C-alpha cells in the first residue's frame, strides 16, 4: 500500500474506530493478518450504516449505497477504486465470501431506508436482518466462524444497532427503535417518547430487559462467533444491565458510563481465550 493509499484507508479506519472504540483493543487479540482485514470490513460496514441510517436525504443515501454496490461488484471481479475495497479484496480470505453476499449487503442497506414500525421485538429484529444477515455471513467467511452461527451472529449485530438507535429515542425518529407492543403495554404514544417522564423510563427499562435477554441467548447459541462481535455484544449487555438499574435508563444509555476500556480489555482477553479452547 502506498503512502497515499495508506492515508486514505486510515481516515476511514479512524471514523470506524470513533464509532466502535472497543475494536482498537479487540485488534490486540487478533492474529496480525486478521487485524487489517477486520479494520477494512468494519470500516466498510460503518460506511454503509452511515448511508443507511445517518443521511437525512434519501436520494443522497441511495446514490452512495448504489456506488458501493458497483464498487463491490467490480472488486469481486478484480477491479477496485476505493481504499477500503482495495485492502479488503487484497486479502486471500475475501475469496471465501459468496459474491452474492456483497450485493445482498447493499440491498440490505437500501432496505434500511424504508424500515417502518414493527409490532413486536421479533418483527423489529427481522426488519434489520435484511442488512445484518449478509453482514454476518460475510464476517463469518472472513474470520472462519461456523456458517451455522451466521443467523445468530446477525442477531448480535441487530441488537447492537437497536441499542445504538435507542440513544435517539427522545428525538422520536422516523425509524422507531422500539416495537409498538411496548408502547401499548406502557400506555404511551410515539410523540410522548420525547418527554422524560416515568412512563418512558419504564418503557426503556422493559425494552432493555428484552434486548438483554435476546443478546444473552444469542451469545449462548454462537460461542464461536467472530471475536469482534462477541466482545461488542458483551459490552452492550453490560451497558443494558447497568442502564436498566438506573433511575433514568435512557440517560444512562446515552451517557455510556466510563471504565469501558478496562471492560473491553477484560472481555477481549476472556473471549479470545474461550475461542482458543473451542
Enumerate the language-model features and the residues they cover:
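Catalytic cores of Mg2+-dependent Asp-rich isoprenoid enzymes
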Residues: 1-89, 105, 128-137, 150-159, ...
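Hydrophobic alpha-helical segments and helix pairs
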Residues: 90-138
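Catalytic palm subdomain of template-directed nucleic-acid polymerases
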Residues: 140-143
Amino acid at each position: 500500500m502506498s503512502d497515499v493509499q495508506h492515508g486514505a484507508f486510515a481516515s476511514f479506519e479512524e471514523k470506524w474506530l470513533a464509532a466502535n472504540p472497543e475494536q482498537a483493543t479487540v485488534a490486540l487479540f487478533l492474529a496480525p493478518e486478521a487485524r487489517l482485514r477486520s479494520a477494512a470490513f468494519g470500516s466498510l460496514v460503518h460506511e454503509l450504516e452511515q448511508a443507511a441510517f445517518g443521511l437525512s436525504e434519501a436520494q443522497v443515501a441511495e446514490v452512495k449505497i448504489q456506488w458501493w454496490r458497483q464498487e463491490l461488484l467490480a472488486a469481486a471481479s478484480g477491479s477496485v477504486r476505493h481504499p477500503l475495497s482495495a485492502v479488503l479484496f487484497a486479502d486471500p480470505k475475501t475469496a471465501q465470501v459468496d459474491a452474492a453476499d456483497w450485493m445482498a449487503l447493499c440491498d440490505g442497506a437500501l432496505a434500511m431506508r424504508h424500515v417502518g414500525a414493527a409490532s413486536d421485538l421479533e418483527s423489529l429484529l427481522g426488519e434489520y436482518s435484511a442488512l445484518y444477515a449478509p453482514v454476518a455471513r460475510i464476517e463469518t467467511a472472513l474470520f472462519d466462524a461456523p456458517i451455522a452461527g451466521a443467523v445468530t451472529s446477525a442477531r448480535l449485530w441487530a441488537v447492537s444497532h437497536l441499542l445504538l438507535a435507542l440513544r435517539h429515542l427522545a428525538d422520536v425518529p422516523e425509524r422507531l427503535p422500539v416495537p409498538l407492543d411496548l408502547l401499548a403495554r406502557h400506555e404511551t404514544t410515539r410523540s410522548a417518547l420525547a418527554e422524560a417522564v416515568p412512563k418512558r423510563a419504564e418503557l426503556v427499562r422493559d425494552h432493555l430487559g428484552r434486548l438483554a435477554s435476546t443478546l444473552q441467548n444469542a451469545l449462548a447459541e454462537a460461542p464461536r462467533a467472530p471475536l469482534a462481535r462477541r466482545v461488542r455484544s458483551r459490552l452492550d449487555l453490560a451497558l443494558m444491565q447497568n442502564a436498566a438499574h438506573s433511575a433514568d435508563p435512557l440517560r444512562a444509555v446515552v451517557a455510556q458510563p466510563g471504565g469501558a476500556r478496562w471492560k473491553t480489555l477484560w472481555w477481549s482477553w476472556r473471549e479470545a481465550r474461550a475461542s482458543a479452547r473451542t
